[in-house]
Each structure stands twice: as structure tokens, then as C-alpha cells.
Design a protein with these regions (language model features):
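Terminal accessory/targeting
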Residues: 2-203, 215, 222-231, 354-394
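Metal-dependent polysaccharide deacetylase catalytic core of the NodB/CE4 family, i.e.
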Residues: 133-157, 162-165, 200-202, 212-214, ...
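Short, flexible, glycine/charge-rich loop motifs used to bind or transfer phosphoryl groups or to couple energy/partner
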Residues: 192-194, 251, 291, 346-349
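Alpha-helix C-terminal capping segments
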Residues: 255-256, 349-350, 378
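Short amphipathic alpha-helix initiation/capping segments at coil-to-helix junctions
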Residues: 335, 339, 364-367
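A short, acidic, amphipathic alpha-helical segment used as a generic capping/interface helix at domain edges
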Residues: 339-351
Length: 394
């Protein structure tokens, strides 16, 4: 509880952006509305002193993390428009979108805690009893956090900082939506972001490839083969064409063997603003179909930055495409985030989200190092789904 009081007190003295920087995260240069957050949430999973490689261990850590996260969400809910404008360095706030996201996130957080608590025992400090509503959960979460064991107080402070920073990331996206579209919300029932994946089930996805021959795309695919995992690779048409010009379709078929490939558009441009966005999609889909076996190609499109037009649903339906977003972002493209940051961030978010679609980029080398560590730490606690199942998401 003292962290809530401390954090709220800091807001009366400092701008939110400065306050967030004081709680175990980093400050980055101010960025444009359409790019990334000015602050990236970081965590240190080494402060959690239990194994998370079994279902019971994962659920225990998930319950504890969700107790902290729920209170941080409640705290951040109190931010005024003026505080958000100053902290997020944006020009306007869509309060309706913010409130919609908060309601949804509180609901998901409650559901995730209920799932994590299915086999709770009274003696466990993370088990706060029956919580049928969000209000019940928030009241009991405060009591539960007060019982944090002494040896986990440093962990609690760290996760509190992470949670405030992560909620700030999401509030920023919600505040901008739909003026700047993103993964934070959906326009129609032909879009999904991973929130409806089953409990403790996760999908891997990679954007922006392929790289040149023997580049990080090849390294990433070799890693997945060694780990017996599959992923969906959302490729840029111009990168695929460039790679094809230096090899052939047979080589690319071998490269993506046992994996899935889908469209990221022809160029990495906002498909909400680009007047050639439809051609970008049809051109890329034509190249995919001409290059790779039908079984490898999924009828999915992932818009760069998650940006697409609010009225694009009819077009995607005419192309038999679903818009495939994500709900767990590694931020691996960010130069201020290293492999250790990614590993800790993704595990923490998996404990909070408990299911979904993980976003990485195979044009950067960090994921190929971070993922084997994540696989080892989680072991059999979660299920990594076959990439072909992503085509069935709704």
C-alpha cells in the first residue's frame, strides 16, 4: 500500500513522465504520436525467488504479479487528461477510448487472476479468496499485497514500477486511438489481437523480414528449429522480393519449412495514411502465393505499427484476410532495450496476460537470444501453439 501512497504523492510534485522514470525503468527521447512510447517498462525477474517452469509455479507468480498490476491499474486510472498530455507528449486525448481500454483491462485482469487462482490454498499470501467482481478484487488485492513476504519486497517495488510504466504505454495508445490506430483496439470482427487465446497458450510472431541471406532471419529460424517451435513471419513484400532475387522460391520454401508466413505489406509504411495501401497488400499477397507453398501462407495481414484505416474492413473481407495484431510487445526494435530487458519484460507480461500473441522482429538479433532463455525459464508451464492455429483465431 505504501507504494500507492508514495506514487500518488510524487504526481503532485512531478510530471508523470518524470515520476515513472524514478521507478526502475528508463526514459527515452520524446517520440512522435505514431511511433513508440517515451518510456519502456522494465522488470527484473531475478527478484522473484521461485521457479516458474511448472503450472503451479507459473500460477503463483502470476497471482502475485496480478495483485500488484491491478493496484497499479487502479492508480493510473486516476490520471487526468492534463497529466496524460504532459506525460505522453501527445496533442490530444480520446477519453472514450481510454475509458474503454480501462474497463476491458480491469476485466481481463480479474479473469486472469481467477484463472491463476483455480487451485489456491488459504495459507498462500497470493490467494485472496473469492473475487467475483473487479471491486472485490481491488479491495482484496490491497490486503494481499500488505502480506508480501519480506524477501519479496524488492520484487514488489520492481513490479509496481513495471506495472505503472506498462499501463502508461497502453494508456498512451488508447488516448491516441482511433486517430492513430494500433493494437490497442479493434475496428471490426475481422481483426484480433490475441486477447481471446486460451489460458496459458501463446503464439510467436515476427515482423519486417526477411533479411538478406544468412542474416538474422536465418538465425531466428534456425533457433526455432532447434527449440522445436513455430512462428508466423509477417514479411514485407519488398524484402521478400529482394531475397528472392538473390536465391529462388525453392530456397525460400526450405527457409520457412515448418513455419508460417503472412503479409506485413509491401513497405513498412503506415497503412492508415498511405494512398497505396491496398496495392501494398494485394501485391504482397500475390508474391507470397507465387513463392511459397499454400500450406505455409496464412491469410493474415499485420499492418506496420498496427496502423490501418477504420473503414478498411470491407477491403480485407474482399481479400479473405484477417487483420492480425498482438497483445504482448517485446519492444525488441528499441535500441535502449537489450536481451535481458526483453527476457524479463516478456516473462512479466506473460504472467500478467496469461495468453496471447508475442511480437518480435526477425530483422533484429535480440529475439533469437532472448527466446531460448524464455523457453527454458517457462518450460512446461505454458503451451507454445503451432503457427497454423493462428489462422483460426477470432
Amino acid at each position: 500500500m505504501f507504494m500507492q501512497v508514495w506514487y500518488r504523492g510524487m504526481l503532485s510534485q512531478l510530471k508523470l513522465g518524470v515520476a515513472i522514470c524514478l521507478v526502475t525503468i528508463i526514459c527515452l527521447p520524446a517520440l512522435a504520436d505514431s511511433v513508440g512510447p517515451a518510456v519502456v517498462a522494465k522488470a527484473d525477474q531475478n527478484l522473484w525467488q521461485g521457479a516458474i517452469n511448472t503450472a503451479d509455479g507459473f500460477n503463483l507468480a502470476s497471482r502475485a504479479t496480478l495483485l500488484v498490476y491491478a493496484l497499479a491499474l487502479q492508480d493510473m486510472q486516476k490520471l487526468s487528461d492534463a497529466e496524460m498530455l504532459a506525460a505522453f507528449k501527445i496533442k490530444s486525448i480520446n477519453r472514450t477510448s481510454v475509458e474503454k481500454w480501462l474497463v476491458k483491462e480491469f476485466g481481463l485482469t480479474l479473469l486472469n487472476y481467477q484463472r491463476a487462482s483455480a487451485n489456491c490454498v488459504v495459507s498462500d499470501w497470493t490467494c485472496v479468496g473469492n473475487v467475483p467482481t473487479t471491486d472485490d478484487f481491488l479491495k482484496k488485492a490491497a490486503d494481499g499485497i500488505a502480506k508480501t513476504p519480506q524477501q519479496l519486497l524488492a520484487w514488489r517495488v520492481n513490479i509496481n514500477g513495471f506495472s505503472h510504466a506498462y499501463v502508461a504505454e497502453q494508456l498512451r495508445l488508447a488516448a491516441l486511438f482511433p486517430k492513430v490506430s494500433s493494437e490497442i483496439d479493434l475496428f471490426n470482427d475481422k481483426e484480433w489481437n490475441g486477447d481471446n487465446v486460451a489460458d496459458r497458450q501463446f503464439f510467436l510472431s515476427f515482423d519486417d523480414g526477411p533479411t538478406g541471406i544468412q542474416g538474422t532471419t536465418d538465425d531466428t529460424l534456425n533457433m526455432l528449429t532447434a527449440e522445436n517451435k513455430s512462428a508466423v513471419f509477417f514479411v514485407l513484400g519488398e524484402h521478400l522480393q529482394s531475397r528472392l532475387s538473390k536465391s529462388d522460391a525453392a530456397a525460400l520454401t526450405g527457409l520457412y519449412k515448418n513455419q508460417c508466413v503472412a503479409s506485413h505489406g509491401w513497405e513498412h509504411q503506415s497503412h492508415a495514411k498511405w494512398d497505396q495501401w491496398q496495392n501494398s497488400i494485394t501485391r504482397t499477397q500475390t508474391l507470397l502465393n507465387a513463392t511459397l507453398p499454400k500450406d505455409n501462407v496464412l491469410l493474415l495481414f499485420r499492418p506496420p505499427y498496427g496502423q490501418r484505416k477504420d473503414d478498411s474492413g470491407t477491403f480485407f473481407q474482399s481479400q479473405s484476410l484477417h487483420v492480425a495484431l498482438w497483445n504482448i510487445d517485446s519492444q525488441d526494435w528499441n535500441g535502449h532495450v537489450d536481451v535481458n530487458d526483453i527476457t524479463n519484460r516478456m516473462i512479466t507480461l506473460m504472467l500478467i496476460k496469461r495468453h496471447g500473441v508475442l511480437l518480435f522482429h526477425d530483422v533484429h538479433p535480440k529475439a533469437k537470444v532472448a527466446l531460448p532463455i524464455i523457453f527454458a525459464k517457462l518450460n512446461n508451464a505454458v503451451e507454445w501453439e503451432n503457427c497454423h492455429q493462428m489462422a483460426l483465431l477470432k
